[in-house]
């Protein structure tokens, strides 16, 4: 037995129907497309969302909301993630160095989620009341 002699068992595979190859095939002449009309032509599709000329649902519904530009440069950091920072000072640059936030982030808020056992000094970041209490309870401090 060689790789070039391998073949599926006889009768295990069915050849696909070949469209438009004579009336005896069952899919000759119109090839299963019926007669006339847009869908019988080549390239005869309608774009996604087209409803036959009726005002589409996407256009019938009102627009709402917007994307805040500040949210693109803001991030929340959990207390548990502060342990990943090497050193005892946590600021914007140290968070970026530890890959906790991306390089485009300009504003960070530390939130109470998870536990902190490490003594850290948080510099120049906003901190929630609960997170502040947890950091101070662990022996850390917050500097503006």
Curated annotation (Swiss-Prot):
It comes from the Bacteria. One of its GO terms (biological process) is translation. The keyword RNA-binding applies. Keywords: Ribonucleoprotein, Ribosomal protein, RNA-binding, rRNA-binding. One of its GO terms (cellular component) is cytosolic large ribosomal subunit. Residues 32-44 have a biased composition (Basic residues). Part of the 50S ribosomal subunit. Binds to the 23S rRNA. Belongs to the universal ribosomal protein uL15 family. This is Large ribosomal subunit protein uL15. It comes from Vibrio campbellii (strain ATCC BAA-1116).
């Amino acid at each position: 037995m060689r790789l070039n002699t391998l073949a599926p068992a006889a009768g295990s595979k069915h050849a696909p129907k070949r469209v438009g190859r004579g009336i005896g095939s069952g899919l000759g002449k119109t090839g299963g497309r019926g007669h006339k009309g847009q869908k019988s032509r080549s390239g005869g599709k309608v774009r996604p969302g087209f409803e036959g000329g009726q005002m589409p649902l996407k256009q019938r519904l009102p627009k709402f909301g917007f994307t805040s530009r500040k949210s693109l440069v803001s991030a929340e950091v959990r207390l548990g993630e502060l342990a990943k920072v090497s050193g005892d000072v946590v600021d914007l640059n140290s968070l970026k160095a530890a890959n906790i936030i991306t390089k485009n982030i300009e504003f960070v808020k530390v939130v109470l989620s998870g536990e902190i056992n490490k003594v850290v000094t948080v510099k120049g970041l906003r901190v929630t009341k609960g997170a502040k209490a947890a950091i101070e309870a662990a022996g850390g401090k917050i500097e503006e």
